[in-house]
A protein has these predicted regions:
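Extended catalytic cores of very large enzyme megasubunits
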Residues: 2-302
Length: 302
């Protein structure tokens, strides 16, 4: 068995080494024919989705080659299950982007023997349990960087971080709050670039968090948090307080029955600030979180 596996690996390596390569002009010309003269589509496909190695050698002439690669690899997996689709059937589904259009990362990653690539476009990350220690924050930062190196877009929620002024067990005595860590994650995103294209990061926080106003204002200062998009998670209770003109209670931890930090705010004023900032700087985005949970499958998507 080991000898058979070794022989298969040797055959695969020989195939990789001897595989035909194409110049950019050759791939662009073939892709231009494929896309019936659409130069933008041809250029984007060659630059972003054609199979390449770490040195930039191009191994696919047009999307036809890519669709054969996808069909071949998925057919290999299909054989493990009842009623598998054949490579030919799968190719017919992919051909000319007719019925199935994979995301960008799957198009470049599936069947890619030349680079370690992600098979998903986006990842929501974080740590289970109490994850607001400095060590936990650094581990999340490292996970973010590793995912971005593999083309993954990343999102994480900062609602677990202690609000500014909270006591901490180190020489700093009190927490710095959300904003410095927003800047840290943002800087990591700008540092991880591929062909001049930086990573994609979304940061969020619950409106219930006592530092949510600082989060909402973070990008109003020019040059701050430039490597991330930010969105605030709004619950029904907050919107009801806006409509009724009543106070809204913020707390930390946000879902605790015995919070250590509690304050009341004017919900209508904070809502006006969200609208003003979004008008002026296009951020923050808004996630109506209770609605998302109601309308989605919570244990799969939220």
């Amino acid at each position: 068995v080991h000898k058979q596996c070794l022989n298969l690996h040797i055959i695969k390596l020989k195939t990789i080494v001897n595989r035909k390569t194409y110049t950019f002009d050759e791939a662009f010309k073939a892709s231009l024919d494929y896309f019936t003269g659409d130069e933008l589509a041809a250029k984007v496909w060659v630059n972003k989705y054609a199979l390449k190695d770490a040195f930039g050698n191009i191994y696919e002439e047009s999307p036809v080659d890519m669709h054969h690669r996808l069909a071949s690899e998925i057919a290999r997996v299909e054989k493990k299950y009842p009623n598998p689709l054949s490579e030919e059937e799968l190719f017919a589904l992919f051909d000319h982007f007719r019925y199935i259009v994979p995301q960008g990362s799957p198009m470049t990653g599936i069947g890619n023997d030349y680079q370690i690539a992600s098979l998903s476009n986006c990842f929501v990350i974080g740590l289970d349990g109490d994850a607001d220690s400095y060590g936990a924050i650094i581990r999340i930062d490292e996970e973010q960087v590793q995912l971005m190196k593999r083309r993954g877009g990343v999102g994480h929620d900062l609602s677990h971080i202690r609000p500014k002024g909270s006591p901490v067990k180190n020489s700093a005595l009190t927490s710095t709050g959300l904003v410095p860590f927003m800047e840290r994650y943002s800087n990591s995103t700008r540092e991880v670039a591929q062909d001049g294209r930086r990573g994609a990061l979304m940061l969020s926080v619950s409106i219930k968090h006592p530092d949510s106003e600082s989060f909402i204002d973070a990008k109003m200062t020019e040059g701050k948090v430039t490597g991330a998009n930010v969105s605030v998670k709004i619950d029904d209770e907050f919107m009801q307080a806006v409509i009724n003109g009543t106070p809204y209670k913020q707390q930390y931890p946000i879902d605790s029955s015995e919070p250590t930090n509690v304050k009341e705010i004017n919900a209508a004023e904070l809502w006006k600030k969200i609208i003003h900032n979004a008008w002026k700087s296009a951020e923050p985005g808004v996630l109506f979180w209770d609605t998302i949970l109601r309308e989605s499958v919570p244990d799969s998507y939220a």
